[in-house]
Amino acid sequence: MARQSFKTRLAGVASLALIPTLLAAQTPAPNPEAPKTAAPVRAPEPGADDSSVFPAPQMVEGLPFETRPPEKADDKPLFPQQTRAPYHKAADYTVTTITNKLHLPWCIAFLPDGKFLITEKENPGALRIVDKDGSISAPIAGLTTLAAPDKLGLLDVALDPNFARNKRVFFTFFERLQDGYSNTYVAHGVLDETAGALYEVTVIFRAIPAAPVKNFSMKQGGRIAFAKDGSLFLPIGDRDQGTPWMVAQQTDNDLGKIIHITQDGLPAANNPYLHKPGVLPEIWSIGTRSQEGLAFDPKTGHLWEIEHGPRGGDELNLIKPGKNYGWPIITHGIDYPGVPIGEGITAKEGLEQPVYYWDPVIAPSGLAFYKGNLFPQWKNSVFVGGLRGRMLDRLELKNDKVVAEEPLLTELHSRIRDVRVGPDGAVYVLTESDRLLKLTPK
């Protein structure tokens, strides 16, 4: 796609002219280079069904805590500890509940004064400030310029790297459009804490195309990760699209991709497909599914992503420019009816393997690398929230490989939506229902 046509699209975003019929008409043409495979059956996201009970993991030092058979009966990892890494307990911790009065919280950001900026996902979507004592503000004003409350869903929120100077916050949201369509957007605004409002709210990016879904909040992606230069990385979910849209493998749409844009919403200058005909210039990588975590490792600078698999095959991926992460051609999971997806293969030349995968699934949501000093035992750790797993999973990394695993917070039996490491070195966790938790050393 030429840069001019991208700017035309951006101009439409900036004007907030969200025209559902136009978006719905933007069905992508098939990519002739994309391998063909049978599309998975559309079904609820793993973890959405609370009727199943996730068994308590066994905690035996040096042995995997997962003992159930994999969903894909003949599945075998392609290298040691690609799945079911040995259990290792690293540190004792204390859990403090800051508040249990939130409504479907989705993301945490840390304000310089020690307060928390938290998104509540939907019904209606809201942005709130939570004080250290647990008091919760009224919804931040200014979001009604984006969409009506019953059509708006908030996802991630992140402070501009220069927030101390410009008070700007970036956030992602989705909007319910007509006829069952929805879409994912990136916006920013200037936060006035005293007034409890966002000003100068501007949409900078709209994923294309809008997509029909049974549940308008399904597989939106939406996490934000800032690069050192201030540009934004953002996953866009595949939106559960089946035949004939093998969208994650097609390069004329944003679905099933990691995108990389400037703070103005333009394609970043170092993107791998910037001048390639037929490829959206914002694309950084392709072939991902329903990504609910994206973060940079502060030690290596490497970008990591987590995504939901189907039945089995949740993934932790090391994201590199121009790479294809394989969905739905390869997967360590199976389709929801219990049959193979496509050819039922887990590897293919030219397609990236996950660094780690979970089978059965944990339904991962939220990704954070430990970078504090409160828990020296957690150095080299990355945390992954588990919705269906009802735990906070700690993975220990060495040379970009998982060498140990430790499920935390299993005693709470809570679906974990987000995890962040605070400026104080404590680990902060959102449960899907209503709680903000703080983990400190015991």
Identify the function of each model-found stretch.
Residues 11-21:
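Bacterial N-terminal signal peptides
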Residues 23-25:
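Boundary at the C-terminal end of the N-terminal hydrophobic targeting segment
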Residues 288, 401-423:
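Conserved blade-ending motifs and adjacent loop-strand segments that build the rim/top face
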Residues 184-194, 248-264, 319-320:
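Beta-propeller blade signature
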Residues 279-320:
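Repeat-solenoid scaffold signature
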Residues 2-13:
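Bacterial N-terminal signal peptides that target proteins for export
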Residues 137-152, 201-220, 263-284, 328-359, ...:
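Surface-exposed loop and turn segments in beta-propeller and other repeat-based domains
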Residues 30-36, 40-243, 293, 302-309, ...:
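Acidic, Gly/Ser/Thr-rich repeat motifs that build Ca2+-stabilized beta-propeller blades
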